[in-house]
Amino acid sequence: MISLSPPTICNSAVENSTFFNCDFSGADLSGTEFIGCQFYDRESQKGCNFSRANLKDAIFKSCDLSMADFRNINALGIEIRHCRAQGSDFRGASFMNMITTRTWFCSAYITNTNLSYANFSKVVLEKCELWENRWMGTQVLGATFSGSDLSGGEFSSFDWRAANVTHCDLTNSELGDLDIRGVDLQGVKLDSYQASLLLERLGIAVMG
């Protein structure tokens, strides 16, 4: 595995570059913009290691981040747009700015990205921009998405009971096997088609 030494390339712009089996663990990548970069080696089926890296305000656009290790990163303000991130591990990632021990806010923009089989277990992504992503088989046990925009998403093989999705925008999403009897949907936004479909699963016919 190739390691960065010294582990700092913050506030840089990197385009159309390839990083196979690279170790960015602990690196300061804050404010760095990656466009059209490859971080996944298809031959070895391995992604890059970003664990414990500072990715505050970092931007990934049109990148392949499949199987990347994002555990325990500082990800406040991160942008991941139009990327492939299948199988990536975000456990322990912090998207929070702690103001006091009881007051915080989250900031993240993960949009138009394939998050199939990624691991977001126990991650807090409240009031974030998370729209038009693919969530097939994504691990979300104990995750909190409360108040986030999850609209336009694809949620096949998604365990709705495992995560907090209260007050989320789910309009225009494919909701997979969502059963409203076992999920707290307080404050959730649904469009009329979704609402009628969910009620039909309970044997309730919606007229008009």
Put a short name on every predicted segment:
Residues 1-208:
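Tandem repeat scaffolds
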